[in-house]
Amino acid sequence: MAAFTAQDVKTLREKTGCGMMDCKKALTNADGDMDKAIDFLREQGLAKAAKKASRIAAEGVAYATTNADASVGVVIEVNAETDFVAKNDSFMDFVKACAQTVIEQNPADVDELLTLKAAGTEQTVAELLQEKIQTIGENIKIRRFERMEGACVAYVHAGGKSGVLVNFTTDIAVNDEFIAYGKDVAMQIAALNTPYLTEADVPAEVIEHEKEVMRQQVINEGKPEAIADKIVMGKIGKFYKENCLVDQEFVKDNKQTIKQYTNNTAKALGGSIEIAKFVRFEKGEGIEKRNDDFAAEVASMM
């Protein structure tokens, strides 16, 4: 009996973009272990480095905003049952009230946020949430948020599919030119799903794992083991350039990296800019939605 399900095949396919039969073979080889199956596909040259997060499936929005002088920012995710709700003005008013409450009152977590008086109302966030559930007719949940202090720029991508908040260390006033630069950086993070800021932020275990997979991939391609390590080092350099924000090519101008774009902007504005940190939330990240028809299709092949 297979050590995995039709849903596992579906999930692996979504994570890697590989064909159904390749995914089934990988899961069989890995005895149902999802991460090992991903590594198997990569070692065979069938899949690129997969971001090991479940498929985006929940509805609602990821939203990001700042206060008036861009000295405090928040990125927040609020989930609902259907994508229709994300276009509902009443739902978006609730999301914005939650974000403003986080900016003004700095709750430690969602549980504390629910107890606070919602910005611009006389109700607690929990009371306002229950009111929205009743009037909209769907279950609504505040899933997570992150708040930052200091120069911040917020960006909402594709109508709430993802929200990005970028925090900067700078001696430059956050004016229109600075915000335009900051939004370029945030858009890059949103579009490429950038996982790390710098090479130093990549965990050692991630690099070791990448090296192991890359080395096996090189050997499977028929390269001599004697030169495998040298090839792997070149591939690791490429990994950094693809996954570390400051080393990435700027999507609007691939002749410069994000670090170079940052330095050039700072020079033009007469000061210094350093990207301190960033957070990207994607709507429904890690939440699965059932797809019975697809699962049945896969099951019929097992």
Which stretches of residues belong to each language-model region?
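N-terminal assembly/interaction segments in proteins that build large macromolecular machines
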Residues: 2-302
